[in-house]
Swiss-Prot record, chain B:
It comes from Drosophila melanogaster (Fruit fly). Gene3D superfamilies: 3.70.10.10. The keyword Cytoplasm applies. The gene is PCNA. This is Proliferating cell nuclear antigen. Expressed at high levels in adult ovary. Residues 61-80 bind DNA. Pfam families: PCNA_C, PCNA_N. PANTHER family: PROLIFERATING CELL NUCLEAR ANTIGEN. The lineage of its organism: Eukaryota, Metazoa, Ecdysozoa, Arthropoda, Hexapoda.
Amino acid sequence: MSLKKALDDCMIDFDRCVLVTDLLEEYKLSYKEVNDVLEAYIKNQEPATKFEKRFLVHGKKKTQGSGAGEDLYSVVLESKLKDWLAKVQDAESQLYSVKIAGGTKSPAATFKPMQHLEVKLAKVEQRPGAGKLVPTANGVPATNGVKSEPSKSQGIKSEASKSSVKVEPSKSSLKTEKDADKPPVGKGKHSPESKKTSPKEQASKAKPAAAKKGSINSFFTAAASKPKDVKATPSKPAAGTMDNFFKKQPPGAQKSPTEKEKETKKAAPAPAKKEPSKKKSPSPTKKTSAANTSVQLFDEESAESSDEEEKLDKLRRKVIGSDNESDVEKPSTSKRRRISDSEDEEQPPKKATEQEVIAVDEEMDREPANETYLDEDGFVITQRKPVKAQPAKKKVSPKATAPASKKKSPPSAGKAGKDGSKTKQAGIMSFFSKK
Amino acid sequence: MFEARLGQATILKKILDAIKDLLNEATFDCSDSGIQLQAMDNSHVSLVSLTLRSDGFDKFRCDRNLSMGMNLGSMAKILKCANNEDNVTMKAQDNADTVTIMFESANQEKVSDYEMKLMNLDQEHLGIPETDFSCVVRMPAMEFARICRDLAQFSESVVICCTKEGVKFSASGDVGTANIKLAQTGSVDKEEEAVIIEMQEPVTLTFACRYLNAFTKATPLSTQVQLSMCADVPLVVEYAIKDLGHIRYYLAPKIEDNET
């Protein structure tokens, strides 16, 4: 709706103080247009109704000593305008607010700077701390300390945010007021738009994430349709389908995790095992994660094939036998790493492999960048690639991923975890067969 | 031709209220034995099974088996237009794509009819096997609703533990833990206030609160609710609809997450 139409339709309540700044924001017009329209309207109405106008006066304070004084901005009544113009050097005035004179009115803001108006200031310096003054809530700039009707201002804000207004009411006090509220960085292109939209985006991003976690729906669809989901892989070949459940569940014998592991090992190839093993063994990885990457080199290969595993195992024995130096002493600095596995020493190697496989799998995920090879002397060399950030990140990840993975596991289980029990929501389809 | 007439619209209203939160759309299968509805909720965690026997209707006629897919929200809207005491008649021609729902005031002075479009719903029907439940608890429906409501404040999951001593509903969360124990009532004057436990063997199962709370929307239909439980089998929450049939909710339990 245009301003003129709004005025003609009496949509603007002149019983309250109508601020030009509000109109600027609301109708997205230039100051000149607003001023013209408003003046014209007032002119039409003037004989019948008397308006009380306020003007913004800008000029320089007359000081006795020097010619050029301080900048002065003031909002003054029409009656006092002449006095002010006389008082102030280089004075200029612009219509600022209008209301119907006299009568009883509900209190209204007589001064309200524009919330979202981009202005370019010719000679105004940014206050250094100005940006800090803007408190933001959820990415939306809070109001700038000037009290305003919340509902109204919100409305204006949202409207203003929809399209960036580029009005330049040259050199008015609005500028300085406004400018103080603007963060210094965002002068040029830092439109309110971006501020406004970003929280929305955040919210919209956050919502699906929350939904993923919380709703059983997401879990269920994940289980049914996405076999890539961590949970849905080996131990439950088709957890979503009934038939499976009935074939396996009623016997009642829920296999122990170790049994399952064995089974899956036999049945599924190593890569398939990867993900569940990740989850099952947070502790072994912690042990190995820090410096003991050399062990996992073997493990990595051992997971690939049993023959290779044996060979490597032998090789490892050999290496360990040849050198008893502990790896811990210089893990971080040395480029070369000798293999030593404290766990190996404690446990018979073949038992250890299980754990190692797990460790390797995880390590493989974490440190794919490292190059490893056997050198001429028979040592396994782990060469860390120059990118240090990656391993660093990945070393942090085990700590972070452990709880994260727990939460992720099934969206429902994440919350169930809160309850102390690790449960996930089963689908009803798992219990009944289709007709 | 299908025609079914109920003396009180309020029953149909309550039935719709009891299922519309879980199901957006459902197919009413009409046969000469009555009306049946079976549908899973969107997430396929729970299943609703409604049975309305033909002999419970004031008038029931179904020449041919008929499946009427309906948007339950729309139907609920139509039923809201009825007064509780109105007679309600559902009518549909064979192979029709609309159903007519007619409300007649008790004194026959006001008759209103609403035609609703039917939908072709491709819904899976599940075979529900006969189960010997380890525990069957009958308790006041209001009490069950109250318990579910209260425990939902503590956690998303409720653990129902049924032993010979009684049935215990527990929830624990960030706030703390909550335990509500109901013992079998010795002798009660009012049958509807009784808590009766039939137990073969103790059972402990975990269920999602939000579904239980959705089930309790059927509370106005019956004074008593029956919970049937068995290990690793869906919970059955049954509300009898007096002289007409029953509504059963099946809820898959939350199972141990072995992979964590």
